[in-house]
């Protein structure tokens, strides 16, 4: 639910496809078939036939430490010009083809909620090697406050997602 909620918080609408029995993760062929039957490319951008909305990303969830077929999903992402974002919360420490889950896409996410592999009671982490994206994420998760010694100026709607010192 948390992954779908994150999509909704951004004003987007999540769409769902079947999972693979072997990994319990998103099935690349089911995704490819869904995209073939429900989307079209316009100037290299993927749009949903039914809603007219742009399809921008896929978010596979690695379940119970089992990595999704990232090779297959990466191929679909490339073919349909989609961003790969991984929910690696339940696969912390898992390896796929010699690489940690959560590091294949533009973004990987981890949760440290009380019921997760590593817990701090709450909070999480964003994994990315894109320095501009990391800078933007840090800005938004710290209330979008512009650094200043005494002024409190916020240049956009931000969030207070800092982890407390007790964590």
Predicted regions and their residues:
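Residue-level detector of solvent-exposed, low-hydrophobicity positions
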Residues: 2-8, 14-16, 41, 69-71, ...
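Active-site region of PLP-dependent enzymes
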Residues: 91-97, 104-167
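PLP-dependent aminotransferase-like
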Residues: 1-63, 67-79, 83-88, 95
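Short, hinge-like loop/turn segments at secondary-structure boundaries
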Residues: 33-35, 100-104
């Amino acid at each position: 639910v948390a992954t779908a909620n994150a999509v909704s918080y951004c004003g987007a609408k999540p769409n769902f496809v079947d999972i693979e029995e072997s990994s319990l993760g998103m099935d690349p062929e089911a995704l490819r078939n869904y995209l073939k039957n429900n989307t079209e490319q316009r100037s290299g951008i993927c749009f949903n036939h039914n809603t007219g909305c742009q399809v921008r990303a896929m978010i596979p969830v690695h379940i119970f430490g089992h990595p999704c077929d990232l090779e297959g999903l990466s191929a679909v992402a490339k073919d349909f010009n989609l961003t790969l974002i991984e929910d690696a919360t339940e696969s912390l420490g898992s390896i796929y083809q010699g690489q940690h889950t959560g590091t294949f896409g533009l973004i990987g996410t981890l949760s440290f909620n009380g019921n997760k592999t590593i817990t701090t009671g709450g909070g999480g982490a964003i994994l990315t090697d894109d320095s501009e994206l990391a800078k933007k994420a840090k800005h938004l998760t710290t209330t979008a406050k512009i650094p200043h010694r005494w002024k409190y100026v916020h240049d956009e709607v931000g969030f207070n997602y800092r982890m407390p010192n007790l964590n």
